[in-house]
C-alpha cells in the first residue's frame, strides 16, 4: 500500500459540460499512462473513480507517488479564465469524498494543486482548483 501524504484537489480546467470520455481523451493526448486524477466529480454530483488508489496518477508532478488526486469538472469561465464554478452537488460530493479519504489516510493533508507554490498568487503556476482548498477543508484536515 502506498503511503499517502497529500490529497490534492483539482479542477479539470474545462467547461462543466466536459464528459468522462473527453477527460480521458485529454489524458491520452498528454501521453499519460494513467489519468491525472483518482476521482472526478461531475456537476450533478456523480463521483467516478478513474484509477485505483494503489496506483499513481498524474496530478501534481513531483508529488504523485505519495498523493491522491481528486478533481471537479469545471474551473474556468466562458472566456477560459479561472473560476470556482462548482455546483452545490459537486461541493457536497467533494466534501464527503475528502472526509472518506481523510479517514482512510489520517496523516494526509488536503490542499489545492496551486498550494504547492505557496499562498501568494504571484507564485502560482496554475490557479487549480480555483478556490482555497486548505481553507475550505480545514475542518477535515484538523479532525484527526
Tell what function each PLM region has:
Residues 33, 63-65:
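Short, flexible loop/turn motifs enriched in small residues
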Residues 1-8, 12, 66, 75-144:
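Basic/polar, cationic surfaces and motifs that engage anionic cell-wall
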Residues 70:
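Ligand-binding face of N-terminal immunoglobulin V-set domains in extracellular IgSF glycoproteins
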Residues 54-61, 99:
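Short amphipathic alpha-helices and their capping/turn segments at secondary-structure boundaries
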Residues 1-55, 129-132:
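Short, conserved "active-site rim" segments that organize catalytic pockets and cofactor/ligand binding
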Amino acid at each position: 500500500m502506498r503511503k499517502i501524504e497529500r490529497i490534492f484537489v483539482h479542477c479539470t480546467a474545462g467547461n462543466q459540460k466536459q464528459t468522462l470520455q473527453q477527460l480521458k481523451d485529454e489524458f491520452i493526448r498528454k501521453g499519460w499512462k494513467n489519468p491525472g486524477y483518482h476521482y472526478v466529480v461531475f456537476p450533478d454530483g456523480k463521483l467516478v473513480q478513474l484509477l485505483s488508489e494503489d496506483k499513481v496518477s498524474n496530478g501534481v508532478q513531483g508529488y504523485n507517488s505519495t498523493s491522491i488526486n481528486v478533481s471537479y469538472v469545471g474551473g474556468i469561465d466562458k472566456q477560459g479564465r479561472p473560476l470556482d464554478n462548482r455546483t452545490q452537488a459537486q461541493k457536497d460530493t467533494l466534501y464527503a469524498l475528502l472526509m472518506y479519504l481523510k479517514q482512510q489516510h489520517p496523516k494526509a493533508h488536503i490542499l489545492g494543486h496551486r498550494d504547492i507554490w505557496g499562498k501568494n498568487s504571484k507564485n502560482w503556476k496554475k490557479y487549480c482548483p480555483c478556490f482555497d482548498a486548505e481553507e475550505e477543508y480545514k475542518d477535515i484536515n484538523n479532525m484527526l
